[in-house]
């Protein structure tokens, strides 16, 4: 048919070897480029996400050039195996300004970026909710499993990162996360390594709602806890639900961390179930003398279980360190 005709002409034109490459590229495009000035494949990130085929078995990279993208970005549940890579963490910015006080919107619809698909990686970009200080305003809302965030910045105030799905596994490496109150919250299992957690107000860093049957909630390893000038009274966490699990291991605490360390959310019952743990932390705020009695100081033996393999349950087919 006519298809063969075109193909034959291509062979004459290209030579045989390149034809195979050409036809393969026609079938799949591995990299989509997003740029504000129209020189890429798309001008906004949502369009690029919508161009990705459902449930792919190969990885597509969406490369986002420097610029400010004012978008409410949704990665739907049928999109998987996608990497969103910015040109630079400082200058590739996804931003929006919804907050919970707009038309009774509620916290859970205020996100700038919502990730419902599995096996999604974000790298070298900023996700921001810039709704000023107007109630809960989520920058990142995750529902997917096996999500990775590498060298990203998360800017917001209250409720910056909502890890919304029980049993979902998330990895944050070398990220900067700032906020005011409960700025990392939810039921998912998440490992944060080499991250900076920056408190903009006297408040609480985490509000985990880990289910009772899940061993690991939030685990922070080798992270740095910093604060804005004048911020002096910050708690490591308070339990959004009973059985909240949060651990800080080999982290550096500024002097803004309160001696008590943890808060019961004005409910003494939470003290019986909360799974709060610390080990090997340094800095002014890491002194354990004043810590609440119901938080655990791990032994050298106990801390050994906090490996990526255990946290992410390697047998369940995902292990980002391979």
Annotate each PLM feature.
Residues 24-322:
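Sequence-level preference for short, compositionally simple segments enriched
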Residues 7-17:
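Bacterial N-terminal signal peptides
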Residues 1-6:
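Short, small-residue-biased leader/transition segments that mark boundaries at the very start
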Residues 18-23:
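Sec/Tat signal peptide C-region and signal peptidase I cleavage site
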């Amino acid at each position: 048919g006519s298809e063969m005709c075109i193909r034959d002409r291509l062979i004459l034109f290209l030579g045989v070897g390149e034809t195979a490459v050409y036809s393969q590229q026609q079938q799949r495009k591995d990299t989509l480029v997003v740029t504000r000035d129209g020189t890429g494949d798309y001008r906004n990130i949502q369009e690029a996400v919508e161009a990705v085929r459902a449930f792919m078995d190969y990885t597509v990279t969406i490369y986002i050039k420097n610029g400010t993208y004012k978008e409410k970005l949704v990665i739907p549940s049928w999109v998987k195996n996608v990497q969103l890579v910015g040109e630079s963490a400082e200058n590739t910015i996804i931003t929006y300004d919804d907050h919970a006080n707009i038309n009774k919107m509620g916290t859970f619809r205020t996100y700038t970026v919502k990730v419902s698909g599995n096996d999604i990686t974000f790298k070298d970009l900023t996700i921001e909710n810039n709704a000023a200080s107007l109630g809960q305003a989520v920058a990142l809302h995750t529902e997917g499993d096996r999500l990775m965030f590498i060298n990203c910045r998360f800017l917001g105030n209250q409720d910056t990162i909502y890890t919304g799905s029980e049993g979902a596994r998330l990895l944050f490496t070398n990220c900067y996360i700032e906020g005011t109150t409960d700025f990392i919250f939810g039921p998912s299992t998440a490992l944060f390594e080499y991250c900076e957690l920056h408190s903009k107000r006297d408040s609480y860093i985490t509000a985990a709602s880990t289910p009772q049957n899940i061993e690991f909630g939030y685990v922070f390893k080798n992270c740095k806890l910093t604060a804005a000038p004048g911020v002096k009274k910050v708690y490591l966490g308070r339990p959004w639900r009973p059985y909240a699990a949060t651990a800080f291991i080999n982290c550096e605490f500024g002097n803004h961390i309160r001696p008590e360390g943890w808060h019961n959310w004005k409910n003494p019952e939470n003290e019986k179930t909360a799974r709060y743990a610390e080990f090997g932390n340094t800095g002014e705020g890491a002194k354990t003398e004043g810590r609440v009695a119901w938080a655990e100081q791990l032994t050298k033996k106990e801390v050994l279980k906090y490996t990526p393999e255990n946290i992410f349950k390697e047998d369940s087919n995902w292990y980002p360190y391979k």
